[in-house]
Amino acid sequence: MPHFVHGRATRSWLLASAFAVALPLAAQAEPLGLPQALARAAQSDPTRPAVEARLKAADAGARQASVRQNPVVGVELEDLTGTGPYSMIDRAQATVYYQQSLDRGGKRQARTALARTEIDLVRLRYQVQVLDLFQAVELAWVEALVAEAQVRLARTRLDIAQRAQGEVDRRVKVARDPLFAGARADTQVAEARIALSQAQMAADTARRNLASHWDGDGDFDLDPAVLDDTAAAEQVAGEASEADLAVLDAERQAATARVRLEQSKAVQDPTWRAGLRYLNEGRDMAVLVGGSIPLARHDTNRGAIERAQAERTAADVDLLSGKVLRERKIARLQAGLAARASEARRIEAEVLPAAERTVALVREGFNRGGFSYLDVIEAQKVLIDARSRRLDALKAFYTDRALLARLTGRHAALIPASETVR
């Protein structure tokens, strides 16, 4: 088993447990951060009992694989009855024997080695399963953050529409604008209210979806400032997750062990027998010793050996290609992070100030009669669209960051350790 599986077992358990114990005390004081969400989900993972049971099963299988073949005790009666001189029981012979088959070719060791690889695979596959869970939780956390930001954006849109509505109403009252301008402003406010209501419902759904990973009720706060942090784009992502590669390596080791087992099956097992024979006719005793061994004339297990060797070759290729493919995905996501971060920063630095300035100027000109209400609507739409585009860029950034975290195993330290089989 890879060293990191055992080396961090106690540490990872303590980290996850500490988060789980501390969370109820801090839930009302601090916003729910990603590490806390991951720790809650890990401690509430409903699949852990099944993993513990699989570990026990794999350990039992390894113990069973190491046992020797059972001996055989038998009794044979010969010449008990028949014809001629054998018609009487006086010439009967009784034999009591002890028989033992021997494993040759390292069969028992090969069986045990293959069974032990199953324990490693159960452990490692559980770690990969938890990393997949962490990815789902992180994506749900991002979705909840973005949904909260959408609520704030919808509220801003409503505020802008209501402010414009007040300005239009004043102009309509003094007959500087026609009545339909007021009706249009009312429509804009109504649409903004609907958008806010929809955003709030979407945010509630996103929070409940996130809380469902630990059977919570969504009663937590999220820090809105987290969404603006794009510093991860400047950090080196790291290599592919050790857990994913360890699974592929363990599968290769299992394939190698299977080759050894099939090769050992090609070696024929002898059977030895020793016993005592009682000759009723003369009341004499005799010792018998014998043995047998199958002739490898037809079944040499060649097909099974070739199949196991081909599977080992496939496992070797899977390990090499798996690492290469993961490194490519990591590089692509790293580049995507930089692009998304750059887009969000440039919108914030270049587009939003200009759009906000445009809204202020158009509004000022509208109050002086230099612009129509359509100009106000267009300027407001440009501002809202720019903020929405920035939010989309941040959502894509954090989505790619979650995918990158899964590929690199960034949250592996939070995986609860399984102590069923040591």
Annotate each language-model stretch with its function:
Residues 13-24:
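Bacterial N-terminal signal peptides
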Residues 95-97, 141, 271, 288-290, ...:
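Membrane-embedded beta-strand positions in outer-membrane beta-barrel channels/transporters
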Residues 73-79, 272-278:
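Transmembrane beta-barrel strands of outer-membrane/channel proteins
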Residues 50-65, 129, 133-158, 163-166, ...:
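Amphipathic alpha-helical coiled-coil segments
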Residues 39-49, 56-71, 85-88, 96-113, ...:
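A glycine-/polar-enriched beta->alpha junction
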Residues 27-77, 92, 101-102, 110, ...:
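Bacterial Sec-pathway N-terminal export signals of envelope proteins
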Residues 2-5, 129-242, 333-340:
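Periplasmic alpha-helical coiled-coil/stalk elements that build and connect Gram-negative outer-membrane
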Residues 3-6, 389-422:
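Acidic, low-complexity, intrinsically disordered peripheral segments
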